[in-house]
Every structure is written in C-alpha cells, then in structure tokens.
Amino acid sequence: MERGIITITENGTVTMPTVPVWMTQQEMSDAFNVFGCDIRRAVHAIYKNMELFESDTMRYIRQDNGISYDVYSLEMVITIAFRLRTKECMAFRRFV
C-alpha cells in the first residue's frame, strides 16, 4: 500500500503528498507536535461519538518485515486536527 504522510514545518508550512494520505498515530503526533496519548484519545472519542467510522477511516497494514500497524485516512487526520490545539494543528486547519 502506497501511502502519503503530511509534514508541517516549524514555520507552519504544510506539505501534502500526491498519493493518498494514510498516517499512523505516531506520525500524526509528530506532525501535530502532541503526545501519542492525545491522538489515541481523539481517535477513541471520534469513533465513540460516531463522527467517523472505523471501517471507513482505518486500515491494518503489514510491512515486508512482518511488522503491522494501523493507519488512518486523511478524513481522520483532518478531524483530529480540529480537536487539538497546537500551532501545527492551526497551520494545518488553515491549509485545509
């Protein structure tokens, strides 16, 4: 699965990949400059409130070396960015 990762520089420049965005919780926490537990909490709340559905926004992928992990769609990344309050999230919201 080819997947893109959004990057946000310190000065607020957002780089959007040309391939579909699918990011892990760790990649989102790095991009938005928050702890992983903040991302996990936001994902859990989004699913609990039925704002988005897991079947539409999460995929389970396995690397060639056998390591597997969950990745989340652009729709989830955007929803999380509107829940968190960091300068990186604000830059991403302006970009969207």
Residue ranges and their predicted role:
Residues 35, 50-54, 84:
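Amphipathic alpha-helical interaction segments
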Residues 51-65:
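Short Lys/Arg-enriched helix C-cap and helix-to-coil transition segments
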Residues 37-41:
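Key DNA-contact positions within bacterial/archaeal DNA-binding proteins
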Residues 43, 47:
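DNA major-groove recognition helix of helix-turn-helix
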Residues 1-34, 61-96:
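Positively charged, aromatic-accented nucleic-acid-binding surfaces
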